[in-house]
Amino acid sequence: MTLTQAQMAPATDSREMVSPAVDLVLGASACCLACVFTNPLEVVKTRLQLQGELQAPGTYPRPYRGFVSSVTAVARADGLWGLQKGLAAGLLYQGLMNGVRFYCYSLACQAGLTQQPGGTVVAGAVAGALGAFVGSPAYLVKTQLQAQTGAAVAVGHQHQHQGVLSALETIWRQQGMLGLWRGVGAAVPRVTVGSAAQLATFTSAKAWVQDQQWFLEDSWLATLAGGMISSIAVVAVMAPFDVVSTRLYNQPVDRAGRGQLYGGLTDCLVKTCQQEGPLALYKGVGPAYLRLGPHTILSMFFWDELRKLALRAQHPGT
């Protein structure tokens, strides 16, 4: 989930801008490339968030006890390739969600909305909400596939899907089209607050790093450091919604397609806090940060390089 400084401060020179359609392709491609590297962390985060679901602390087995031991547990149970569970669904989600998000934000930039006070945050939040809605079915399948594992280390409900298409077909057949958007009520605020927080903090964080003169002027290390600092704010506001999203997406449903554990966002928040304590809303926050930091930087790097290529093709010889 990243938007670069170039997007946050729209260029006045048209030669430095690409069309919203191009931004859609570049943004989706960049985030998909980043997803390939960070998906193992997403698998670990998902398992940690489901571990001990609606059980009091200390009353359940803990096959996952931290980042390193969790990676080892996944590799032992599912093989090394198990660390890439749900990758196809993750790529689909990143492509859909970020494609829509970059496209909508680029439209806002072209219209001059981001130059208004608070426009950057509002545009980022709205673009994030729209992207989350479009990508919700892919996130649903990704979560369920990443939760699947052997009985010895299983956490959360096990859906037993055979793959992305099989999962989509099963959900459609059993729950109808609306079933594909089950859990979207938590996904939309999750991406909305994350997108707004990222946009509100990245520029100032990068500027602060540059003011410290730790790196050479225009060094990519300043972008990296700014992104890592910004990621702290993003994880802090996203983590509770992330836990709730994972649980709503993964819970079993009855024949009418209603969740058997939670009635929705608020119900999940209340039940989780009552039975596991408030800190349960930050389960998996370590891997979440370890994933988001690299994902942010990789997305920025890939997006920036792809954008440079697009601008060269758009204005050859300049």
Curated annotation (Swiss-Prot):
Chief location category: mitochondrion
Membrane topology recorded in Swiss-Prot or TrEMBL: Multi-pass membrane protein
Database matches in PROSITE patterns: SOLCAR
Solcar repeats: 18-111, 115-208, 218-309
Coiled-coil portions: none
Subcellular location(s) per record: Mitochondrion inner membrane
Keyword line: Membrane, Mitochondrion, Mitochondrion inner membrane, Repeat, Transmembrane, Transmembrane helix, Transport
GO CC annotation, single: mitochondrial inner membrane
Catalytic activity: a dicarboxylate(in) + sulfate(out) = a dicarboxylate(out) + sulfate(in)
Spans traversing the lipid bilayer: 21-41, 59-79, 112-134, 184-205, 220-240, 292-315
Biological process (GO), any one: blastocyst hatching
Domain of life: Eukaryota
InterPro entries named among the record's database cross-references: Mito_Carrier_Antiporter, Mitochondrial_sb/sol_carrier, Mt_carrier_dom_sf
Function description: Putative antiporter that exchanges dicarboxylates and sulfur oxoanions across the inner membrane of mitochondria.
Homology family: Belongs to the mitochondrial carrier (TC 2.A.29) family.
Name under which the protein is recorded: Solute carrier family 25 member 34
Gene that specifies this protein: Slc25a34
